[in-house]
Amino acid sequence: MRRLLPSIVFLFVIGARLLPAQTTATMPVRPDSVKFAVIGDMGTGDPPQYEVGARMSEARASFPFQLVIMVGDNLYGRQREQDFVTKFEKPYAPLLAAGVLFFASLGNHDDARAALSYPRFNMNGQRYYSYARRNVRFFALDSNQMDPVQVAWIDRALRESTDQWKICYFHHPLYSDGGRHGPTVDLRVVLEPIFVKYGVNVVFSGHDHIYERIKPQFGITYFVNGSSGELRKGDTRPSQMTAAYFDQNQAFSLVEVAGDDMFFQARSRAGQIVDGGVIHRGVGNQIRVVP
């Protein structure tokens, strides 16, 4: 069995209770790794969103991520030019000033026309798109309209990808134990066979306003990151598929891909580490999550 780095001690969430650990979990922070953050359902413009943004900026002091993936509902309510300022630019001002790039996907509350044309979302007018960083390729999808053209595109894009890591993200979760929405089964029927066929490693979604990590399904680890602004406290309904969850406070995630390992942490608005682990990409693109 692959040995964990001795400097890493993880915290895990069981029944929404934060379990104590001896030390604070750390990331390897290797110079040649891909480092990014994950946020979703954040664009409220309310104090909790600003506090999450502050925690992200603080985390970056020791974990210098250069990109943030956004899993939708990037802005709620009106989405005028001034709303992009109060619900995006101001909450993440230190990150934007440091040159951190944000890559958005569309949620059901997003104004697609406004989002697609907003330069700091880096969508370049495309509802779905992909981009690469070192050995990782990211695929952003529009789960609001999973039409045949988009399905054909993701099938082809995944088939043609030779990258070691394939990470997909979009708004509606294929798996979720959130009480408000739960899994998007019709979307899962369409996308999961494609993901399995072409070796997708990890999928990030939102929509349910909780943090959740699902036990690997057909070799894929699914995360719900829907509480970076909005929150439905106590909304998780744990099942046999639940690996970890946190629904007592807003949260965001930090991820580092280093070779065949993907280290991840979920952090709360208060700065607590509420989940963490390592996903190891093994032979034949099979993965193993520790723990």
How would you describe each model-predicted region?
Residues 21-83, 144, 177:
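N-terminal active-site segment of His-dependent metallophosphoesterases
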Residues 1-4:
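Positively charged n-region of N-terminal signal peptides that target proteins for export
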